[in-house]
Amino acid sequence: VKTVTIAESINIMSKTIGPAMKEKNAKPIQEMAVAEAEAGADFLDVNIGPARKGGDEMMEWLVKTIHEVVALPLSLDTTNPVAMEAGLKAHKKGGQPLVNSVSCQADRIDAGLELVKKYGAQMVGLLWGTEGMPRDVNERAALAVDLVYKANEKGIPSQDIFIDPIATPVKGEINQVIACTEFMGMLKDLAPGCKSVVGLSNVSNGTPDKLRPFLNRAYLLMLYQQGLYSAIVDAYDKELMALCRGEHPELVELVSKVMAGGEVESKALPTQQQHYLKTVRVLMGKSLYSDSWLEI
């Protein structure tokens, strides 16, 4: 069983890729696209941010530049609708592109859905409402049901909708992490036929760089237990990509047992499994987060 992967590294915030985007320097971007494809990514995310000035030209150039070297579908990641449309127009390879994203904000949702329908794209339905971040599971559920209803009304089929409940940093509000996990388990009943996606790196935001992969990997396996379909991932994390391919059944089993409330004696486990056990306990809110959670 596999998790569909959307590789996250072609991002305007990157120290190497950002300048290459602005200077229309194809080489580093194409090299990264090839590396992410070779790592096994199913989609490549192309994140240009709000790109207020010249975003349409930039997105069109990026789609064509990337598609010169790989034939994967792209996740077009921008809050600029003009840039989004330019990317959708230019997207000719790899099947349906993914609009990342359509949020639930009253002033944005209709225009977003129109673009998805017009270009026959798939979409990330971001559960960010007019009041901002949903506070709990119930607010996420209400936003999801409303979003899917509106999308279906426009003629967008449920199988083209990837619901994103918004993962938040474990260093922030642990109840939000728990709500995201819980919501994932409810999604198939709330919105039958829809897919799901989560930005895994969000959960480790603000934690020490060398520890981030532990959180990202453990959270992937927790959400996988809850029926996760796809994830926005660091394709350069080999262990994470192996988990997405369905390798390491012993880790899947361990996480499943911990989430079901089973007793696990950590001292009897190999080091790698001890790390997963400790990390899952933090992400479930059973242990308090601190930068030394793996040593405790």
How would you label these PLM feature ranges?
Residues 111, 118-266:
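Catalytic alpha/beta core domains of metabolic enzymes, predominantly
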